Amino acid sequence: MAHFAELDENNIVLRVVVVGNDINTSAGPLGENDMHVDGETWCSKFFKTETNTWKQTSYDNNFRKQYAGIGYTYDAAKNKFISPKPHDSWALDANDDWQAPITYPTVTEEGGVKYMISWNENNLRWTATDNSDPVNNFNWDATALTWNNI
């Protein structure tokens, strides 16, 4: 099966559909010709969306960086799908992956207990909880590379 993403006028993914590998292209079946323009044209005609663009996406991430999802952006210059920005403070790195302004914590567990780590956009820092009773809350100290109990 082949997967195609429908893009709006800003190259934002609206939906992803699955079509058969047996669709004909000028080079043979679609299943043997990834990213063939004839697959895009077929989707446009079949789904009656001549004003929108279609791009094939790889379920196994074999091409176009990653599998497209609703809200992803297709970067035509780089020929890849980029996930939505998770937080305003994050920026794309050289691989087009979103990175927080503070590196992800290097300590993810203590004494065999894993921290539940999340990004706090309001304070621009990593926070965590453990699964003790009562739950402990922590802030990541990016300089000392330790968790501080708060």
Q: How would you describe each model-predicted region?
A:
Residues M1-I150:
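Viral virion structural and adsorption modules
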